[in-house]
């Protein structure tokens, strides 16, 4: 196991891969560096003296400016490093030197072919409430249906939420779009849409967003219109489960996979282990004709030009500029400083500034060209790497990936989290300590890249196989625990 890593040849800091004691002498690229204080795991230390006001370089890019003279061997963190991010910026499209990944041999998994041509990796029956007022009824329906679930139906899930009424303008529109996206999701073999009757987003309104449906697959129940909603729901659920049970897994080309990519509870190893592993995975899937979705726009701030210059054309570049600046304007409108993002857990794990976090976060995008830029709740329609507008919040962003069509989400974490999303959510640990302590949460240990000297390419191949296995029916830890979460982006007034 290495003591440290210098990520890029131009960096003036290195990252401790394990705790390094004060007075330890390390050979960094042929130069002896002696630490002048203890360096925690995942944190940065200086390998070339940095003067006050000079940039601190990591990943080959600036992550902020020194707030004091920092000698060789010193710890670099919030006490002596400050962000260099500002407000809205002007950007220039500079695509030279970027090319897409080369096509590779196809891969396959066992999935569910739907009548509309989409492919699911689960065959579940979903209950989608139009409004939070019927959440308790939805959960009761879920419990009854689970007790009667036939063979061939993976699970019955009620996706409760607090919205659907007392919302205005964009919030109400977003709720309707997200619910419609879920109703049309291929992981759902069948869906019961459960309404109250007097809400803003009542069933008749929502139908305009859902579009044409197969009445065997999607059924509607407005509970104010019936005498006994439980009896009516049980009848409808039995019909829906019988329909869903007719689908069987069959061999499907991996080009049909759409995988969301998200990180949360990041630490100083996120950009060294788990995120680059996911990035290589993304390149592998794209090379086989598949699709990946990168979101959490605020965690692109400071690294956005990397993604902009990888846009396949000028139109996508302009869309990415709007993606970034629209989110910055959202922050400004609400009086939030753009750069105040790293959480206490991020900082404890070694991430200092938003640039530091973002440069690690965008490692998940790999090296392929950006082929699509999506608005929040917009379904993906272009194969390859897509950027999706959504905030950094774990539940909101992961739900957004699912709503845009992801059949699965890859979630990297250095601190750990038990949450789930509407689709299988693969938890990838950045460090082996987390993987060992939280084996009931973690599905893949990318920390072995550090502790076991596992080559990054081998880790990515293992992850690719795990994704195929999960797509073929293997349950992730959150599914085993029975976790299924949903969160919708809220920005405005609640009436």
Residue ranges and their predicted role:
Residues 1-408, 415-418, 423-495:
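Metallocofactor- and cofactor-centric catalytic cores in central/energy metabolism, strongly enriched
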